[in-house]
């Protein structure tokens, strides 16, 4: 079947839903597609479509990151429904890195919970520039005062993580009622999308820089070859162009023989697009999540770097005890988790310290066990045992 071409007639924005488990992120995502489908701006999806594979739904917990697409009057959106359960924060770190903005879903019945806070912190760490709040399950709260209190609490929380709490729109919604077709609540979904259009700035695309795409997933398509999927971070890539596969193993050259977005063919993919790239002569085993596809000669992988790091306090979900030089955590870089070592550190003012306490800001030297495409100015998270314990930025490449 010939695939239809993707029409690029509206600005494209990547957003997603974040927030505490069971606050209604997936239901709200489904409601958005259903409300917009009535205007011909989306394909309606139900909860099951978005929640994905059966074993995840049996536990009632979303594990994988689901992608849906829809349009508003002025924009085309790719929307990721991020995992909410604490165990899957790892997925969120890799998923949230793709967001130009996020809808923070918070249930009016509960108010902000542990993961609400963790997701706001993560949004800050991975550089999500703007948030809009969907105060969900408002059909279940009769008392206007309770809603006002929850709104105040959310605004204070946003402020504490350096988001502009007073300015961020909070829209009262009910994903479930909107899904059931209740017109009052459907109009609140439209109000939410108007707020998203207005408050999430159109991203500045880095189209003119050399092409780079971090690999998120790899598929083998019988008779066609290997497809790598991911979000193009910068630059553009045309069919027929040579690209390099960099990181984890030896760099190798391949040719892009096809570019697809949402099952439609493109002549070229541009910064911000979530695409699948068909690669010539590459086996599925040759490429894995965490590698990057780049313009030939534009980037080399590295193992040693200096970074500026904030180590989370115990109250923020970080470590309870100090760590010392030689500490071996996981470094989350783009879509990769790489084991590494913090070989040396000083206090952020350059003075010597024996150990790093939760809440400290440090300058550190890190060494990774395998080479990865790290660059100056890039953000990373430091994790251990399934939780974020630090957030940093690469200040200098050493080797």
Curated annotation (Swiss-Prot):
Residues making up the signal peptide according to the UniProt record: none
E.C. code: 3.6.5.3
Protein name as catalogued: Elongation factor Tu
Keyword terms of this UniProt record: Cytoplasm, Elongation factor, GTP-binding, Hydrolase, Magnesium, Metal-binding, Nucleotide-binding, Protein biosynthesis
Cellular compartment(s): Cytoplasm
EC category: hydrolase
Superkingdom of source: Bacteria
GO MF terms, alphabetically ordered: GTP binding; GTPase activity; translation elongation factor activity
SUBUNIT field: Monomer.
Pfam families: GTP_EFTU (PF00009), GTP_EFTU_D2 (PF03144), GTP_EFTU_D3 (PF03143)
Catalytic reaction equation(s): GTP + H2O = GDP + phosphate + H(+)
Region annotated G5, chain positions: 174-176
Protein's job: GTP hydrolase that promotes the GTP-dependent binding of aminoacyl-tRNA to the A-site of ribosomes during protein biosynthesis.
Annotated binding of Mg(2+), by residue: 26
Annotated region described as G1, given as residue ranges: 19-26
Annotated region described as G2, given as residue ranges: 60-64
Keyword ATP-binding carried by entry: no
GO cellular component: cytosol
Family: Belongs to the TRAFAC class translation factor GTPase superfamily. Classic translation factor GTPase family. EF-Tu/EF-1A subfamily.
Domain (tr-type G) ranges: 10-204
InterPro entries cross-referenced by the UniProt entry: EF-Tu_GTP-bd, EF-Tu_GTPase, EFTu-like_2, EFTU_2, G_TR_CS, P-loop_NTPase, Small_GTP-bd, T_Tr_GTP-bd_dom
Gene for this chain: tuf
Region (G3): 81-84
């Amino acid at each position: 079947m010939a695939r239809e071409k993707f029409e690029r007639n509206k600005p494209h924005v990547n957003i997603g839903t974040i927030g505490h488990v069971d606050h209604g992120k997936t239901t709200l995502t489904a409601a958005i597609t259903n409300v917009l489908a009535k205007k011909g701006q989306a394909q309606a999806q139900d909860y099951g479509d978005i929640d994905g594979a059966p074993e995840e739904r049996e536990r009632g917990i979303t594990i994988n990151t689901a992608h849906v697409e829809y349009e508003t009057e002025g924009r085309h959106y790719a929307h990721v429904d991020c995992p909410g359960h604490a165990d899957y924060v790892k997925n969120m770190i890799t998923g949230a890195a793709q967001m130009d903005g996020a809808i923070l879903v918070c249930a009016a019945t509960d108010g902000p919970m542990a993961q609400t806070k963790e997701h706001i912190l993560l949004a800050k760490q991975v550089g999500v520039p703007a948030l809009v709040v969907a105060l969900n399950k408002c059909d279940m709260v009769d008392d206007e005062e309770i809603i006002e209190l929850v709104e105040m609490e959310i605004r204070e929380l946003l402020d504490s993580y350096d988001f502009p709490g007073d300015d961020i729109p909070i829209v009262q919604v009910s994903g479930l009622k909107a899904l059931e077709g209740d017109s009052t609540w459907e109009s609140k979904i439209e109000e939410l999308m108007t707020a998203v259009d207005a408050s999430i700035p159109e991203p500045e695309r880095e189209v003119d820089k050399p092409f780079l795409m971090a690999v998120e997933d790899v598929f083998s398509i019988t008779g066609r070859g290997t497809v790598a999927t991911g979000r193009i971070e910068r630059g553009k890539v045309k069919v027929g162009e040579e690209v390099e596969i960099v990181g984890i193993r030896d760099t190798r050259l391949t040719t892009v023989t096809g570019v697809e977005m949402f099952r439609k063919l493109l002549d070229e993919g541009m910064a911000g697009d979530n695409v699948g790239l068909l690669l010539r002569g590459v086996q599925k085993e040759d490429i894995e999540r965490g590698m990057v596809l780049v313009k030939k000669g534009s980037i080399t992988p590295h193992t040693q770097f200096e970074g500026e790091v904030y180590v989370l306090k115990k109250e923020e979900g970080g470590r309870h005890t100090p760590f010392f030089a030689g500490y071996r955590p996981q470094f989350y870089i783009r879509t990769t988790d790489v084991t590494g070592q913090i070989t040396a550190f000083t206090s952020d003012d350059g003075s010597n310290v024996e150990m790093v306490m939760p809440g400290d800001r440090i300058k550190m030297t890190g060494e990774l066990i395998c080479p990865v495409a790290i660059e100056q100015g890039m953000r990373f998270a430091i994790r251990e045992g399934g939780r974020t314990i630090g957030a940093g930025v690469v200040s200098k490449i050493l080797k």
